Amino acid sequence: MSLPMMGQSKYVSVSDGHFLKDGKPYYYVGTNFWYGAILGSEGQGGNRQRLVRELDLMKRMGIDNLRILVGSDGERGVTTKVEPTLQVRPGVYNDTILAGLDYLLMEMGKRQMVAVLYLNNSWEWSGGYGFYLEHAGAGKAPRPNEDGYPAYMNFVAQYASNQKAHELFYDYVQFILGRTNRYTGVAYKDDPAIMSWQIGNEPRAFAKEALPAFEQWLAEASALIRSLDGNHLISVGSEGSWGCENDWDCYERICADKNIDYCNIHLWPYNWSWARQDHLIEDLPQAKANTKDYIDKHLDICARLNKPLVMEEFGYPRDDFQFALGTSTKGRDGFYQYVFSLVADNAEQGGYFAGCNFWGWGGYAQPKHEQQWLVGDDYTGDPAQEQQGLNSVFSGDKSTLKVIRSQVKRMKKLR
């Protein structure tokens, strides 16, 4: 396949298993900045001054790819859910948050940064599956902090086959993709500040028997997105085989879909019991070994599909499972260095790794409550259901920022 001429496309594209931006190879180090649209708003939670500072810091570091939640869904006052919400009820939108998303994309465009925007969430922290099921008449979604994750996961396993829930989501997709930015006058479908539409954050079937319906839903969703926007890339947002009930064939099939342009994987050693909270340093070698095995298997799939791979989430707690600013990050730094080395080594050899987004950006946040986010607190890289500081990289985390800068330099040499 011939490469486009310089400047032929203003959008990030894929050619022969690799990303192109402005006609050149595009390799990157990015981050997860889920709260960007809220920060860009002028209502509750909004802080445009902080947003500009965060974007400027990231830009100075060479971080130019941000993975962002379009918006949260549902009622407010749920302690484990992000607020303010964007979609209050199906088809009822909070214009303040929409303005925040517009502002964010405008500011990113000024800095030649690009966004990966995810539209749904299998987890409770932004509504997602549970929100759509409730409004499809499936009953009240359990709250994991009160009812436990098994009850929640059993409930949302219905989503894969609930056509009414899908239709409500598709209405939302059409609304968002049909939007025009109020500040720039540019339609979202024409905005080069958007790299990719992502179906969801870690979409899962939540049950092996739900996998066929899950695959069909992803195919429908990607086809809808493609029909609405022929300019931007589309991705699933998957964790990898972990998000497919450890069915590797399922992962390969969802990535093979003609409307899916590239593959995603996530890595969470602590969440996946590869590392224990009281042995984070001691368990790092095992976490690294499992990480390499997981990555290698997914790279093999990407080679068969000839599609790029992005390590779109990865994180590691602070030493001794601390959360406060200034606490040690030796284990995290070691894990980041290892993941970065695997990504860069493969990319330098012409492999399918194209980039990575660490989780997540805490930046200039000053958390007030470690154990739980409360309304009025600064947003961090940790959503409302998690301890504030658990996986966040703050502006004061000098050793971690040094590791990130080193990777940025390495990846930019490939451009």
Question: How would you describe each model-predicted region?
Answer:
Residues 1-8:
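Bacterial Sec-dependent N-terminal signal peptides
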Residues 9-309, 314-414:
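Active-site mouth of glycoside hydrolases
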